[in-house]
Amino acid sequence: MPRNISFSMTTPQFLDGSKDVTRRMGWTHLKTGDVLQAVEKAMGLKKGEKIKPLGLIRVVNVRREPLNQMCADLAYGEKEVAREGFPGRSETDFVLWFADSHHCKPDAIVTRIEFERLPIDVKGVPQP
């Protein structure tokens, strides 16, 4: 059974396919090729709420980097912000939003996870 990974702050971007990169605090154990179960929300569920699966993803690339690397290299930052599902948002705005929502500093070391969604067959079974 794959480990859950929540997209509670970016569910629309995940679902519309505009997001293929996510940054996380921790997640240092991941390796290229790992398969994860994307979910709408994994923590903080109220009584009676259930985890809602969004689909399976495969890790294509994973590395650790400073969150504010996006601001140090603006060309990189512009591409990364778009890959996070926020085209047109500034690099600085994204970094400050992430730092605030994750209670970290803009220069925190984060895990950058690039992923691909696994296709589903007609029976709803994910395909490798």
Regions found by a protein language model. Name each.
Residues 1-128:
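Structured alpha/beta reader/binder surfaces that contact nucleic acids or chromatin modification marks
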